């Protein structure tokens, strides 16, 4: 089992990683929800099936893919944070 200081350091690293993910996710969401953009889930074609004019479809698809990856990774990091925080509380209780 890691020492309390090591556990705290790992928690700080995980928290910083999660914050970076949240920052990138917010930037992507802002780009995709600008006026004229399709958003995170909107259609990329019009009612007739043609691509939406003035929208870089490759960029939108890339952003959506990256957002989905970040969302999944964020969930994993959050679970790891919860686990390590519980372990830290357990360690702190044992050392008292």
Where do the PLM segments sit?
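Intrinsically disordered, Ser/Thr/Pro/Gly-rich linkers and terminal tails that flank
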Residues: 1-96
